[in-house]
């Protein structure tokens, strides 16, 4: 809505490419930005749960990929649509006063971020202070739940407001994905499915395997839920890596990150769907630039995985 308000100062027909550049830039930036942190996208958490990675651990793997992909994606958008970047917009600024609630919200946000990022160091110290025999399990989850409780207790938001503004369907989808991954792993189903795939790719070069897996997940996630795809495939490809005597990190990260790389179809990611729903971006325009971005993501993710994770 904010960008649409700003873009309304332009001529829809004359400056159409600028409209498309800005709107797709926002959608794609949201997708790429989500790769950087554990909470950025459900596939991240699914892959992290199978690899037993914490918030800080994921930052070390996801952030470099995000930083590499972001300028390349903006570059593709510029090359394809050639927007007018020299335009000037009239803007009105409203002074926002720092109320007690806003200050408390900022404090909670900073505290949660610090606890997530430095949880590996803080968790043992906190556990020792509390007299616990071992570090707190699922520390990142406990931090998030504690923050939600503090928000309600301090009156920043009521429980009814939390209920009304929480996307419960997304949470159930996310939880279902984690459950599916766990069931596939512990039931042995992922190993059975992996054995059939190993027979086909065994003996191939690791980089070729990485490219095939990256291409497979990127194409698949264009047409299916990235959460469901990651939930199904992460445990399978971890089993494949183990059968090939490879580190499981490589294939799992390719699936986890690649599941977010849907840039051609409106149904690929929620940001794509939101931008497409504005009516200013055609599906053909998304495909026009998205095919180049998809190919770029396949190569970059596969290359990083091969060089550092396999």
State the predicted function of each range.
Residues 162, 277-296:
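Interfacial loop-to-transmembrane junctions
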Residues 4, 8-11, 80-82, 151-164, ...:
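C-terminal ends of transmembrane helices
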Residues 27-39, 215-226, 256-267:
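Transmembrane alpha-helix interface/packing and boundary motifs in multi-pass membrane proteins
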Residues 57-195, 292-298, 302-310:
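Hydrophobic transmembrane alpha-helices of multi-pass small-molecule transporters
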Residues 1-35, 44-51, 226-257:
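Hydrophobic transmembrane alpha-helices that form the pore/transport pathway of multi-pass ion
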Residues 25-28, 63-64, 68, 146, ...:
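Hydrophobic residues within alpha-helical transmembrane segments
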Residues 1-13, 163-244:
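Membrane-embedded alpha-helical segments and adjacent helix-loop junctions characteristic
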Residues 64-70, 136-148, 196-209, 250-265:
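Structural signature of hydrophobic alpha-helical transmembrane segments
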């Amino acid at each position: 809505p904010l960008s649409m308000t700003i873009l309304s100062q332009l001529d829809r027909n004359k400056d159409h490419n600028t409209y498309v550049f800005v709107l797709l830039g926002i959608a794609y930036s949201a997708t790429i930005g989500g790769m950087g942190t554990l909470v950025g996208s459900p596939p991240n958490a699914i892959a992290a749960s199978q690899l037993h990675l914490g918030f800080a651990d994921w930052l070390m793997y996801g952030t470099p990929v995000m930083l590499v992909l972001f300028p390349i994606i903006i570059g593709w958008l510029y090359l394809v649509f050639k927007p007018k970047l020299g335009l000037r917009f009239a803007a009105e600024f409203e002074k926002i006063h720092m109320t007690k609630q806003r200050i408390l919200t900022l404090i909670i946000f900073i505290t949660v971020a610090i606890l997530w990022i430095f949880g590996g160091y803080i968790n043992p110290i906190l556990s020792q202070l509390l007299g616990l025999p071992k570090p707190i399990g699922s520390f990142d989850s406990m931090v998030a739940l504690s923050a939600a409780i503090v928000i309600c207790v301090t009156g920043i938001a009521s429980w009814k407001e939390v209920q009304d503004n929480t996307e419960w369907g997304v949470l159930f989808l996310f939880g279902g994905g984690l459950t599916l991954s766990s069931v596939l792993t512990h039931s042995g189903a992922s190993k059975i499915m992996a054995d059939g795939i190993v027979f086909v790719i065994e003996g191939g070069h690791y980089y070729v395997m990485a490219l095939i897996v990256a291409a497979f997940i990127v194409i698949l996630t264009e047409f299916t839920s990235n959460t469901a795809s990651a939930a199904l495939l992460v445990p399978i490809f971890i089993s494949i890596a183990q059968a090939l005597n490879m580190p499981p990190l490589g294939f799992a990260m390719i699936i986890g990150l690649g599941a977010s790389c849907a840039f051609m179809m409106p149904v690929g990611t929620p940001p794509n769907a939101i931008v497409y729903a504005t009516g200013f971006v055609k599906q053909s325009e998304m495909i026009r630039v998205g095919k180049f971005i998809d190919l770029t993501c396949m190569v970059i993710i596969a290359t990083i995985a091969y060089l550092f994770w396999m």
